């Protein structure tokens, strides 16, 4: 090791790092390797290891960089490294302090032990007592008086036997409580994981064992509004119906009569039970001579046929095909004989099919016997009779089946042939679609029969399940002639529960794919599996909270879809946390684990909380809905997301710490390639290497895309993006709000869609019910809407609105009184006024029950008072009657009504309701309205508003006993539609408000929050507009997904907004580039995983899965595009700068993540040292002037007008100015002048002051490459005192023998270097440098803000006094620096000054493999460089270095002693390999590096950061660093 001991000197460590004394001006006292090692405490010493190539890892792990493979390393085996190096003289300082490394003597031990396994500290161990802590990479076991530079750095360790894994042995220490939560995670990760696991297991057991398991047998349960005005009335009315009967709360009859008639009259004649019993006990009208057993009806199973080729079904092959399908698919099933209706024990009834009707009309024995003539004859018959059917004269009972002739009393105007067997009516009514014989098509030669129905003589219901599963589920539904497109077996909801569980395989597939993506991204199967376990556990714990803690008894099937959403969100959080962990590890590699955890959680916990809270809030916002299932789903999903967040800040950090400490590189394939070099070339090894190569190539391409290409695309075309996305937003708003609009559901609740639209069950309900006349009539489309007015019962829903089975109890109105004369007169007048309204429908039939007071008054007037038995209920009394007369006579009138008319009163019959004391407690009036029942929302809305407003106005004048009346009708579906439309808008608005609030609280910036909300609004409009175009209707599932859109779309905008605020750059463009490069890849991965999770849902049969999958794919693509292009472009054009839009807050209230950014103004940002403290950003770029705003790293790619000189001069201006201003003083080089670029010719004087204000305390330094060449000159090593004339000393320290030979080339010692995709060259001359090393431990993505890119701080300055050259590696080309670069140097006007100058090109050394003739290739023209006198910006000062020579040229063959020998290679990016102009010679590459921090902040371990590969096979032998 070489160490300086001056205040303004630097220390060159064996890991290539430089520890300047700028941060700590205390002098550096001499120390050798042993001394440094002795300073390590036992705790520090036991927790570290050294890797095979000299990089130490923390926490007991070995991490090494990728080295060349066997065929790429140097062919000759190098001698043992650790021996005394007699030529190595340590550097000295201009001060008189003792040297750190005395000159080696004969008895001195080896410079570096071959198996240097001395552990180094995880903490910042000071090498010398009076020097600031540095990152000590290697410490030999023996004293190291000198450092041997005879051997290239990688091979120095490469050939040494190294123990691959060293267990982490912690010394025993007394127990002490952790000081913080981060310390708890870092020191006790197993305890944290154990506690979390125990809690999860307990929750799982209690959640499963205590409450009943959910029942999904009725998928429609909970799909009803609760708490709305209509909903409360409907619930009350249903409760009233259920509580009306014998010994119930209410009764239609007085109690003394009810007891006698209870057994025969207590059943509801219209109840489902009655209907089912009637259905079971039906007497089949079997006649010996009849062909069919019965009339087809709704209770039979049926299927719908259509032609496979699109032709008409009215042809002989199609008709026979339908018969064959019936026989082969239904009647041949083993269970059919047990299910079918029979005329005799021997055979089942025939099916009602078109072929059988044609057979009976033409006296054929069966469908198979009919011929073409029969088909034509039947068609002619239908043409003749269709008009009679259409005008209503041909009815269902025109044929007398008993007499086998036409009924003489009916259908007198219908020809006999049209009534035969009622066949024509049944064909037109049941078997063919309604468009078959319309007047328009009656004249066609062959009317088009598109659809035909087939009725099977089996009742629909559960009994048909096996027939469907065996013969229909997996059949393609076609025999080549006809196709079954619709099925109605009555098993849709029963089958749904089975499919709901079966289709969970698709979320499982999605989880597996997301696992693979996460594994590739995190490079850790352990972290991936633990993350997925946390996601599953979130659902388990959420179920426990939902059922046990929150006491939710109802668990709708929609809750299962939360798994899909959580998989995407959980993966997002894992990506964010792992990303921030890696940044933190790189930012502060020498930090303790607890500090790393603390910094990671400081940002990641905040970022994850914002996204989790906004998404959870969007789910919780659904609680404002009135629909039970939506409310329950919102609570469950929101709770699951919050539980997932808690696990992500407890479980996942502990998992990462555990992985870092014990599990890193535990599997062979996950080791780095250099660890496998000496293994046998097994198939497993080769496969792993290939896998690494592929992953590396992909990740490198993605890194370049997100850090360079994407910012370039976003910024350069920002106005185009703004215009395009604004146009999309306007178009989406037009589609959603104006035309075609989001339609409300068009299917009744009983037909609610649960399978995908192409399923035959759904097609029957959605399409074919409307096409057959019997369904249209049965469906109730011709039924008039009733107007039911109720008094005496309060319209209150006092049940549990979160449990659809809890409807509460009936609440009677204590103020109700109808017996008073005033009430009698008012209610009679009310009935009379209602009959005069336009919405009242007058029927021809006599109405006894609509308005009971009218019937009662008439009955009283007809009673003769001469009969004593009738008194007092007779005509003697005039209306209104006395209260006691009314109460007595109303009971008698009701009993007389049934006795005289036989009219039975049921629970739904209008009239008075009595309690057990025969007191009238309620009254029901019912009238028919002119409005017909429809599913159209507008018509039902008009009906409800008109009737309700009229009744409310009338009730305002009612007497006190009748003032609390209310009206109800068949409004269940209308209420559902109304609740969906209103609730969805309210939930979305609430979600947007919460998102805005959270954004505001997170960023404290109104402008960014506003931009985020605008981006979210655009996302919502485009997404919902797309769903409208896909044919979505706003049903229950759709309402949930759309309201959740806000929560899912806010994530990306939040992440970008937070990153924008955290950006250290003062200008908009820098902030945008920072946010894109810092979180862009994580956001894309998050979108990808959620998109994949949604895509995997698409094959599902259950509609809930497919719709959620469609929605998730749309929302991910659209929200990512809006956040990346629209939101970022808004920030680039009108984004806040400095404190613009910032809410002023006391420092104590500011989030720690923003405290430094808020407190640092653009003017002092460069001086602030707090930027490196925060884990989210590294070195700030320093203040920039406006001229820089349009320049960034891919300028040539973004604009053809941007020339190479402009770009390179811009970059060198910034780089060199930052280097010299911030580091020259530290290195003993006074800053006499500032470097000025050619760019200043066009931009003139703006640049100087701004460009030359680098952050002095950021310790940024330009890192260099040098020519590594063997030096055999004993006098090559001299002590240099760095001062104003350090370059003069350098002239004396180099010999001719150290000059480049034909085999010399620019080499990076461990073969790893970061590359960038652009060609930028910055060269300068400073003090002597030679032995440049890249830290082999570099793992992780690094994105210093300095130049809007991600270069690791891993190239370090080594002022060693010889230039080494390494022999060619393997069969790679020989590189040499051949041509003089004299032309690229400024002609100095005075000997003591020179400036940084850019060649404007990337130099490539080429070598002819045959004659070793060396040439120099150039990528760009270098003619743009001029002398320093005429091209420099007058506004800035010059950066000068004192030289003692006037000759500033470099000889092409030798480095003369009178010449400056430092090549400032400040190269940024990857140089592509090109051939030399005149011969086919391979070109080497000079690798570009950047200015960066001097404190050698290298990662001390690999924190599941993707690995670094350097193989010549990759990217044309490119040297790249993996940062994705």
Swiss-Prot record:
Domain SSD as annotated: residue spans: 486-658
InterPro entries for this protein: Dispatched_Hh_regulator (IPR052081), HMGCR/SNAP/NPC1-like_SSD (IPR053958), MMPL_dom (IPR004869), SSD (IPR000731)
UniProt cross-references to PROSITE patterns, sorted A to Z: SSD
GO molecular function, one term: molecular carrier activity
Membrane topology: Multi-pass membrane protein
Sugar-modified residues: 59, 582
Record localization: Membrane
Cellular component terms per the entry's GO annotation: basolateral plasma membrane; membrane
Cited function: Functions in hedgehog (Hh) signaling. Regulates the release and extracellular accumulation of cholesterol-modified hedgehog proteins and is hence required for effective production of the Hh signal. Synergizes with SCUBE2 to cause an increase in SHH secretion.
Assembly and oligomerization: Interacts with SHH via the cholesterol anchor of the dually lipid-modified SHH (ShhNp).
Protein's UniProt name: Protein dispatched homolog 1
Lineage: Eukaryota, Metazoa, Chordata, Craniata, Vertebrata
